[in-house]
Amino acid sequence: QLRCSPRRISRLMKELDIHSVTVNKWKAASASKTKVEQRPNLLKQDFPTTGLNQKWTADMTYIQTKRNGWCYLSTIMDLHSRRIIGYSFSKKMATDLVLKTLESAVKNRTITGDLIIHTDLGSQYTSDDYNQRLTELHIRHSYSRKGCPYDNAPMEAFHASLKKECVYPVPVFEDYETAAAVLFEYVHAFYNRKRIHSSLGYQTPLQVEIAT
């Protein structure tokens, strides 16, 4: 085991003309400075279901591009099949983005019973417009506890797969249009139709839905 004092390290770095590199930690921008109080967590990490359209989960993730900077992918997942049923991609992180995702999910499904949608406490999801639309659709809104990603673990797992299998290999998309095309292909052609899940008995989301 080698021992070396900070002073010696500093001296050697100067002699060899070596400079340390400081990387600024990237911090996600918030669309609102308003402090959000805790809201009801109806799901409480109870992810299992007995059928479709009982529990949905929604979230956004950041996608970097060279020409357009950060872009935003918004999705909704049905927890029964783990299928992405709502999808929207935008250059702006706004309430319109998550509303568009919600409308795409509703268009793809027939809601007949009690349905919960679970999100974080982001300003887009706590907005009056979003919650008014949920009320109109008779969908109950559940929220993660602040700073607790485990409350939305299935969506966190989806984002991890997306980044590992689709985003990081690039490593940075040229522009918004390129990212949009690649992400759409990954979600709709691969993730929903071909990617097997151990939690689904090594079936794809589409196979589960067909069998339901």
For each of these PLM feature ranges, what is it?
Residues 1-51, 148, 204-212:
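Basic, flexible linker segments flanking DNA-binding modules
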Residues 1-2, 48-49, 66-67, 121, ...:
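Conserved, non-catalytic sequence blocks in retroelement Pol enzymes and Pol-derived host proteins
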Residues 9, 13, 43, 59, ...:
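Mobile genetic element proteins and their domesticated derivatives, centered on retroelements
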Residues 29-32, 119-121, 127-130, 143-163, ...:
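RNase H-like two-metal-ion nuclease catalytic core shared by retroviral integrases
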Residues 49-85, 91-92:
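An active-site-proximal beta-strand-loop segment
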Residues 69, 87-110:
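Active-site beta-loop-alpha junctions of metal-dependent nucleic acid enzymes
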Residues 81-87, 141-143, 168-170:
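Short small-residue beta-strand/loop micro-motif enriched in glycine and branched aliphatics
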Residues 135-139, 162-212:
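C-terminal domain-tail junction helix/linker
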